[in-house]
Design a protein with these regions (language model features):
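Charged, heptad-repeat coiled-coil alpha-helices that serve as long linker/dimerization "arms"
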Residues: 1-62
Length: 62
């Protein structure tokens, strides 16, 4: 199933905004005092990066 370019672009923008929020949280040294929270944020960050990469690949498809 192919989503329209506009939908994919909005999805990328939304995920990139969430990624920036996670980057802000991960930049806070206090986060690392709670290992479980830090692991959760890193897991979410990695998942979002993979989703964004996949969306960019779909956007590049003819």
């Amino acid at each position: 199933m192919h989503l329209g370019r506009g939908i994919i672009e909005r999805d990328i923008e939304s995920r990139e905004a969430a990624l920036r929020e996670l980057e802000t949280q991960l930049a806070d040294p206090e986060v690392y005092h709670d290992g479980a929270r830090a692991r959760d944020l890193v897991t979410r960050y990695d998942r979002l990066r993979a989703e964004i990469e996949s969306l960019w690949q779909r956007l590049a498809e003819p």
